[in-house]
Amino acid sequence: DEPLSNVDQSFKEEIQEKLKKILKDSKITTIIVTHDSYEAFYLGSKCGIILNQELKQYDDPYNVYHLPNSIEVVNFLNRGTLITAEVTSPKSLENEDLGTITGNFLKPFPIGSKVKLLVQPEDLHHDDKSNLKFEVIDRKFRGTNFIYTLKTPSNMLIPVFVHSHHIHQHEVDEKFGIKRPIHIDHIVCF
């Protein structure tokens, strides 16, 4: 239970690498309990999300992150924003702030359905020349990237990843352009 929770980050990554190799080489099935999703994604060939003593999703780490099966799993991972949208075709939705969003639905919804669309930080792309701009209300530097939190006219807060080598770094209160058309490969809706 939380075996690496009190270890310094640099040492923790080294221990994780060694632990993963030992477990793989010795072919030992192990259950590691953690609240650190990155740790679970790195160490686990499978991840289980248990909430309120109930297994909500059991899958490989990629699917748990990119294809969460419930709003509860989305909220637990806390990696994106659920926005209200309307299904306008078998491959598109409309949102009042983002406009048209295209992609491949993981499960079909009837045209006209009101849904909650999961927008992950990597789903939207920065474009200074875009006319779709939102206010930066927070900026977190993470070494290799920034995570900008954008506020839309309807007060949605949307996180967006931008590589840290990007020439124009935005400050809080600046406008931040989102590339159009918006295309999300795996459209996850509830």
What is the role of each PLM region?
Residues G80, K91-F190:
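Non-catalytic connector elements of ABC transporters
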Residues E17, I71, A85, F134-E135:
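Small-residue-enriched segments and motifs
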Residues I28-I31, L82, N145:
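Secondary-structure boundary/capping residues
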